Amino acid sequence: MPHLFEGVGVALATPFTNNEVDYNALEKHVDFLLDNGVKAIIVNGTTAESPTLTEEEKEQVLESVIKQVNHRVTIIAGTGTNNTAKSIQASQRAKALGADAIMLITPYYNKTNQRGLVKHFETIANEVELPVVLYNVPSRTNMTIEPETVETLSHNQYIVAIKDATNDFEYYEDVKSRINQEEFALYSGNDDNVVEFYQRGGNGVISVIANAIPKEFQALYDAKQSGQDISNDFEPISKLLDALSVDVNPIPIKALTSHLGFGNYELRLPLLPLEDADAKVLINVFEQFKAGEL
């Protein structure tokens, strides 16, 4: 079966104005992403501040994006929680709204073992009957989907990809050696490692920085696919990524999306915006990047 997408998927930020979801800004941002060639949009993930969105807001944001995109690119809904039953409910709602696939994070806080992970993911997948992207991000969950577990899960007809945010190429190669990549896609969850990830045969990236530079980030993948050496092309992007590392995601990227006109620079507690001085430095680096001066 064809992969959900090849190239750049965007982990969409949620714009706020006066602490409410700004649907006009959301529409502008999605238009910007579509106009600049992204291949997928991931809604209600980490970058979306999903823990501080209400269930109603999550559904409304997803519905808004699905209607606007109108089948032009793949829509993946973040529906994973540390509660299997609630994950099923959220996934069924996403399916009813028209999502193309769901992304499921590993359970956090009430951590399980690898047997529990298999049961958790397979129960959701078999109940919902929608393509599933596994989300492995141990830096946030303190839980890893071991390569053997990925292999087991890859045999489920609905589990079709993994977002690998380990930044560990030994892990990547172990997983890659165990799966049939014609049927199971490997997506990076780290913008800073995409050059090597692509060189090692990865199918794409679920990206944070593409919220602000979708065209440039997709062009990088396209150049690699055409056989070009993209190391030099990545250098200015790498410098922008260094500037983005000033704080945890999505705090810095929302400074850039706000700068681009997609909502106010607002986050919901416990997240706070960058200090003014840090935001100015980041925006200055971004403007240098856009001007070709990095």
From Swiss-Prot:
InterPro entries: Aldolase_TIM (IPR013785), DapA (IPR005263), DapA-like (IPR002220), Schiff_base-form_aldolases_AS (IPR020625). Keywords: Amino-acid biosynthesis, Cytoplasm, Diaminopimelate biosynthesis, Lyase, Lysine biosynthesis, Schiff base. The active site is at Y135 (proton donor/acceptor), K163 (schiff-base intermediate with substrate). The record marks T46, Y109 as: Part of a proton relay during catalysis. GO terms for molecular function: 4-hydroxy-tetrahydrodipicolinate synthase activity. It is an enzyme of class 4 (lyase). It is found in: Cytoplasm. Its EC number is 4.3.3.7. Pfam families: DHDPS. The keyword Cytoplasm applies. One of its GO terms (biological process) is diaminopimelate biosynthetic process. Disulfide bonds: none annotated. Pathway: Amino-acid biosynthesis; L-lysine biosynthesis via DAP pathway; (S)-tetrahydrodipicolinate from L-aspartate: step 3/4. CDD domains: DHDPS. Coiled coil: none annotated. HAMAP family: DapA (MF_00418). Belongs to the DapA family. Homodimer. Catalyzes the condensation of (S)-aspartate-beta-semialdehyde [(S)-ASA] and pyruvate to 4-hydroxy-tetrahydrodipicolinate (HTPA). This is 4-hydroxy-tetrahydrodipicolinate synthase.
